[in-house]
Amino acid sequence: MSTNPNAGIQPLTNSISQSASAHPELYHTTSHESVSTYQLQSQLSHSATSNLSTAANFHTRPPIANDENAQNLSTVNSSHSSELSKANLVDVEKCIQDPLLQIFPTVEDPDRFVFSIDPKSPLIAVNWPFRKKLKITCVYSYVALCSTFASSVFSVPAEAITTIFHISLTVSLLTMTVFLCGYIAGPIVWAPLSELSGRKLPLLIGMFGFGIFNISVAVAKDIQTIMMCRFFSGFFASAPLTVVAAAFADMYSNKHRGTAITIFAALVFDGPLVSPIIGGFLTKSYLGWRWTEYITSFMGFFALVIVYLFCDETYSKAIIRNKAKEYRAMSGNYFVHAKSEEEVLTVPDVAKNYLLVPMKLLFTEPIVFLITLYSSFVYAILYLLLEAYPIIFSEKRHFSMGVAELPYIGLLVGVFIGSAINISFEPWYYRRCLALGGKPDPEARLPPMMIGCFMFPAGIFWLSWSGYYSYVHWIVPTLSGLATGCGILLIFLQCLNYLIDAYLFRAASAVAANTIMRSAMAAGFPLFAVQMFHNMGVGWAGSLLGFIAVALIPMPFAFFFFGRKIREKSKMAVVL
């Protein structure tokens, strides 16, 4: 009795025919080709050469058995007319002559079975319609705003809990410090997770944990619980700060990426300035200080919902992995896989890439150290001002809680002015890059910073001495925020851009070093702010900070004129 060697694959071809009929957009066929086929690029030791068309794709490989009948089975490159590269066609029914191969398929070089997507495919985030990009940009910007909103929302209730829990003011200010310490620890987890699973999952996990731990703070019965939950709230809140900028880089080309990142940075700085205003009025009202955390948790859960419902994955490697998984399940061929699925990230890799290498860059590269020092200083001053403003407007001018925080609006407006200035420079920077053949020009990032380096100390001196004299009208120190906020935004943002362009292939490590130092300084500055402004006086305490800012003015000019020469002598910087 004879047997049909192709009988074993007939159900599979029938299944693919049904899938192709149900999902024609996933398959590419011509008028004379059957849809019950795979589009494969394959070569067998046997002489099987008939044509069929397919679209199949898959990911992990099962254990491979040795079989001499299939040692020359080679690559599968699935293809779709808009998604996949074209491949030669081979008759699937003649690919498997031995029934054992249906159970234990053998391949000589499984690494050649790589699934890929055309870079111009509409699946890739950079090719999405502008309306879709704008929607995701708004959602992710809101998520980042939630994160930084929580960092300082407890600055006003900190004074109230000193009486409730019988602690000193310095201890109560630790609630902001431990939150910012969570910013230091979080990126060590979220950055590698975003590389492995994409941008969306870290945001979902982050906002869920963020909401849970903010509720925990709201219902806490002792200061120890508040401190612990504030740390973990900061840990989960660091997810959007780690991931959102990368998601914008996924979606936008060089021409528009700078504008998107500027908007993101503005909202990151606006969060700590808006929350004390809301926190002040909530604490003063019948709702009490606990509602500052309830409101924050509700914001986090709302962010979780809208990210889940309205945001697609932007990371190209994750998109390819997901498509490979779909095609693998549809076709049953477990050889084909996405290249990124071969990557294995171990704990030593995480320690090296996100701790050791950043620290090495920080202490061996002058550019990284100086730029990080400057950006960390202005970032820390932002959180220090959260303690200085209540002294100026509440203690010296006797503004009530809530009203005393309204002068932060001056800083808010200043941040938006800085954003507008930065966006106005983007076309000029883009033309500079085009003149270099599309290569980044780090020094071209610095002109906005040259403006900010003067506005920043000017705003600090303005605030210090107009705030020192209580008879000066309150609008005068409030308007100082226009210069201070503008300077902070311009300096901080261009410092990050300069690091990314100067250390192109090590940009993640350079930014990680910047994140660690700036979060550490921001965590420490509020702890001595009150004592410094009380003991030295508002005028001289602010002047001390202003003199430090003046000493840093030459930095952007030095890097603008000599940055390329410094990079040429560096072992890690990029010179294109």
Swiss-Prot record:
Q: Where in the cell is it found?
A: Endoplasmic reticulum; Golgi apparatus; Membrane
Q: Name one Pfam family in it.
A: MFS_1
DNA damage listed as a keyword? no
Q: Which residues cross the membrane?
A: 149-169, 173-193, 200-220, 231-251, 261-281, 291-311, 366-386, 401-421, 446-466, 472-492, 503-525, 542-562
PROSITE patterns per the UniProt record, alphabetical: MFS
Instruction: Give the primary localization class.
Output: endoplasmic reticulum
From the Swiss-Prot or TrEMBL record, give the protein name: Uncharacterized transporter C569.05c
Q: Which organism is it from?
A: Schizosaccharomyces pombe (strain 972 / ATCC 24843) (Fission yeast)
